[in-house]
Amino acid sequence: MLVVPTVCLASGDEHDPSQPKIFLRGDIYYANLEPHLGSEQGGIRPVVVVQNNTANCYSPNLIVAPVTSNTAKKPDHQAHVLVDGNRAFLQPSMILAKSVQTISKGRLIRPMGRLSIPELIRLNYALLYQLDLNEWVWRKEAYERYLRYHR
């Protein structure tokens, strides 16, 4: 279910704060990821918004997954999502769920498009894998076991 805040007063456009700007989970933007350190993804590249829509509305930051056109490197990695055929990309690309990061909305350059529902579902599974959420999100008994041993 897609829940979109009806009013997004906290995140107006930086050039015209009276115009609300709504960022949605699954949106694709060009972003400036410089400066970066070490093996962090850097440069001006596409990113996919993975943060929930309520936080997208009220936070000055976004949680994003960077995208690369280097689809040959570890194409079968469970935290990589191949996107082929999405009009936002000029060539097949890979969403790097293993490299999610928090960025300021000011790093966004321009919108590129949106993920399709099947692409977003594949990204959800990649994030569940990367963040090791499968057991905790989908299994109530695991949470109850955690509570028993960590009180």
Residue ranges of predicted features:
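Short alpha-helix capping/helix-loop boundary micro-motifs
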Residues: D13-S18
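Short, charged beta-turn/beta-strand-edge "cap" motif at the junction between a beta-strand
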Residues: E34-G38
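Compact nucleic-acid interaction/catalytic patches
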Residues: S39-I44, V49-G85
